[in-house]
């Protein structure tokens, strides 16, 4: 089998690491059997040569192997709403707000997230600010999804093996393959996904990785203004996997009768500010926050196969917000998760 030194040499020569070799190297890293120096060198080398679809697929396969899984029996209309983060836009937690709206409209949502790394407020931070207990065991998350239609998986609880590479990632301080693996390794194995990415090149890459990993209906999105969400401020690049086929296209707010507006007003300094915007959107307060959540929830409902199109999803999302159902989902998740407080 390939040695870490051989793998490093290969990245230096800009040559690909093959599937079985990548599986082997990732297992060494996840088990803590590779020295921090070699692990740092290899993940940096991969970034410099640019990770291939095959390398990312193999790495995601191993991360899934090492994860603590959430077993959800019925996976119809089951969707993961996630962003790679790292888009540097510092907006409020649009994907977290999207989770509540999507669940209110009939999807089951497994949200996989963490505390803010590059953002001022990660999904875990804003959920805690809302009063949600994010520290659940896998079977409690499964119960949460079954009962409320929503489950939040706090990444450190589900990827314990990541602690072996965490110090290396922290010290390097640059983006590595691990930044794009998070969205590919949902511990509940949701077959459908709305995935936001921080770079246009990742749209085509991530949708093909999800195809290889056996996903059902995936929309990978990149807002041309740099957002890892469906954007109101620019066109959004979409890579869609459906029935095994991939199509790539662009969507615009105007396609759905929405106005193009800058995302500037969506910027927040911390989780408390993010909570305010999130609740304003769910309380049906007219404004950019409500519109961008509606647009993203419409897209998520389409990927969850609750809606027949994004336009149909937007209609359902508007209903879920206007009826007060989306706002009620926040209290429901708070109540359900608080019963597990130790």
UniProtKB/Swiss-Prot annotation:
Domain of life (superkingdom): Bacteria
Q: Which SUPFAM superfamilies match?
A: Nucleoside phosphorylase/phosphoribosyltransferase catalytic domain, Nucleoside phosphorylase/phosphoribosyltransferase N-terminal domain
State the InterPro entries in the record.
Anthranilate_Pribosyl_Tfrase, Glycosyl_Trfase_fam3, Glycosyl_Trfase_fam3_N_dom, Glycosyl_Trfase_fam3_N_dom_sf, Nuc_phospho_transferase
Q: How is the cofactor bound?
A: Binds 2 magnesium ions per monomer.
In which residues is anthranilate 1 bound?
Answer: 83, 114
Q: Which GO terms describe its cellular component?
A: cytosol
UniProt binding sites for Mg(2+) 2: 228-229
Q: Does the keyword Iron apply?
A: no
GO BP terms in the entry:
L-tryptophan biosynthetic process
Q: Which reactions fall under this protein's catalytic activity?
A: N-(5-phospho-beta-D-ribosyl)anthranilate + diphosphate = 5-phospho-alpha-D-ribose 1-diphosphate + anthranilate
Q: Which organism is it from?
A: Paraburkholderia phymatum (strain DSM 17167 / CIP 108236 / LMG 21445 / STM815) (Burkholderia phymatum)
Sorted alphabetically, the keyword list is:
Amino-acid biosynthesis, Aromatic amino acid biosynthesis, Glycosyltransferase, Magnesium, Metal-binding, Transferase, Tryptophan biosynthesis
Indicate the family of this protein: Belongs to the anthranilate phosphoribosyltransferase family.
Give the metabolic or biological pathway.
Amino-acid biosynthesis; L-tryptophan biosynthesis; L-tryptophan from chorismate: step 2/5
Where does this protein have coiled-coil stretches? none
Binding sites annotated in the UniProt record for 5-phospho-alpha-D-ribose 1-diphosphate: 83, 86-87, 91, 93-96, 111-119, 123
Name the needed cofactors: Mg(2+)
Q: Where along the chain is anthranilate 2 bound?
A: 169
Q: What does this protein do?
A: Catalyzes the transfer of the phosphoribosyl group of 5-phosphorylribose-1-pyrophosphate (PRPP) to anthranilate to yield N-(5'-phosphoribosyl)-anthranilate (PRA).
Q: Cite the GO molecular-function annotations of the record.
A: anthranilate phosphoribosyltransferase activity; magnesium ion binding
The UniProt record lists the EC number as 2.4.2.18
Kindly provide the name given to this protein in its UniProt entry: Anthranilate phosphoribosyltransferase
Q: Which residues bind Mg(2+) 1?
A: 95, 229
Q: Which cysteines are joined by disulfide bonds?
A: none
Assembly state and interactors?
Answer: Homodimer.
């Amino acid at each position: 089998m390939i040695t870490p030194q051989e793998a490093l040499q290969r990245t230096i020569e800009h040559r690909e690491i093959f599937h079985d070799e990548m599986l082997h190297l990732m297992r060494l890293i996840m088990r803590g059997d590779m020295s921090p120096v070699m692990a740092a060198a290899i993940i940096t080398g991969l970034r410099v040569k640019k990770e291939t679809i095959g390398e990312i697929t193999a790495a995601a396969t191993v991360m899934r192997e090492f994860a603590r899984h959430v077993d959800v029996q019925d996976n119809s209309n089951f969707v993961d709403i996630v962003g790679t983060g790292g888009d540097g836009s510092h907006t409020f937690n649009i994907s977290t707000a999207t989770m509540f709206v999507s669940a209110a409209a009939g999807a089951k949502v497994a949200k996989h997230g963490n505390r803010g790394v590059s953002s001022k407020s990660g999904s875990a931070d804003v959920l805690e600010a809302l009063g949600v207990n994010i520290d659940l065991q896998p079977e409690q998350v499964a119960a949460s999804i079954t009962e409320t239609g929503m489950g939040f998986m706090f990444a450190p609880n589900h990827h314990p093996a990541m602690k072996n590479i965490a110090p290396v990632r922290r010290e390097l301080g640059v983006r590595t393959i691990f930044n794009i693996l998070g969205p590919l390794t949902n511990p509940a194995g949701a077959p459908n996904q709305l995935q936001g990415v921080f770079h246009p090149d990742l749209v085509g890459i991530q949708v093909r990785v999800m195809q290889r990993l056996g996903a059902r209906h995936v929309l990978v999105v990149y807002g041309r203004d740099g957002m890892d969400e469906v954007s109101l401020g620019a066109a959004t690049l979409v890579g869609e996997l459906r029935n095994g086929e991939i199509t790539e296209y662009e969507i615009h707010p105007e396609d759905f009768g929405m106005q193009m507006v800058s995302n500037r007003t969506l910027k927040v300094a911390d989780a408390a500010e993010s909570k305010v915007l999130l609740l304003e959107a769910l309380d049906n307060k007219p404004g950019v926050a409500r519109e961008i959540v509606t647009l993203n929830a419409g897209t998520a409902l389409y990927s969850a196969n609750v809606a027949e199109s994004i336009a149909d999803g937007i209609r359902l999302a508007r209903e879920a917000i206007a009826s007060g159902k989306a706002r009620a989902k926040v209290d429901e998740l708070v109540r359900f998760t608080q019963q597990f407080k130790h």
